[in-house]
């Protein structure tokens, strides 16, 4: 896990990027060569990729040959790339936004719309449900469930601030907010819609706004919040 100062240095040192994709048509077999952009074109149409400042100059340089173009752009001076997901041993569904320098354990599940910021850690077998947010440095242990729409607050600055820590075997209901610096103890359950402003002891059920202790976890409660390993099964 990166500490706050390492994350700050990573962002500061990173090359800021404004990548674009451009669909072009025209006399493309006559386009000038370029070492700074990638072109995938035939004689009449194609696609080019590169940094906006390079693409902008290239379009101007070749404007007499380009009949029309459409530009796609989704970021400006971005400091943190997306995590390369190809070799992550987890189930990651379309639409999840996961920044670089995130750690994802084996068999984890990241659902559609989840947002995972730099420095976050997700343990083995943990599910991050739809539209949940893990802020910078938020740490979730093994075999947890973070409910849909829940927010684990991030702390990158000030660098001395403590991140959110969710220990192993915790179940967080939907639309829960866990504030900066909070630790949720092993085996605990946080009821849906709660706002957690204080540390949660292990094996405790809490709920409300702000969250308060409702009871210690018993076998009946455990059975209602069972983590199903079948949902974490991978083919490989």
Curated annotation (Swiss-Prot):
Disulfide bonds: none annotated. Keywords: Acyltransferase, Amino-acid biosynthesis, Diaminopimelate biosynthesis, Lysine biosynthesis, Repeat, Transferase. Pathway: Amino-acid biosynthesis; L-lysine biosynthesis via DAP pathway; LL-2,6-diaminopimelate from (S)-tetrahydrodipicolinate (acetylase route): step 1/3. It catalyses: (S)-2,3,4,5-tetrahydrodipicolinate + acetyl-CoA + H2O = L-2-acetamido-6-oxoheptanedioate + CoA. Gene3D superfamilies: Hexapeptide repeat proteins, Malonyl-CoA ACP transacylase, ACP-binding. InterPro entries: DapH, DapH_N, Hexapep, Hexapep_transf_CS, Trans_hexapeptide_repeat, Trimer_LpxA-like_sf. Pfam families: DapH_N, Hexapep, Hexapep_2. Its EC number is 2.3.1.89. The keyword Acyltransferase applies. Catalyzes the transfer of an acetyl group from acetyl-CoA to tetrahydrodipicolinate. This is 2,3,4,5-tetrahydropyridine-2,6-dicarboxylate N-acetyltransferase. The gene is dapH.
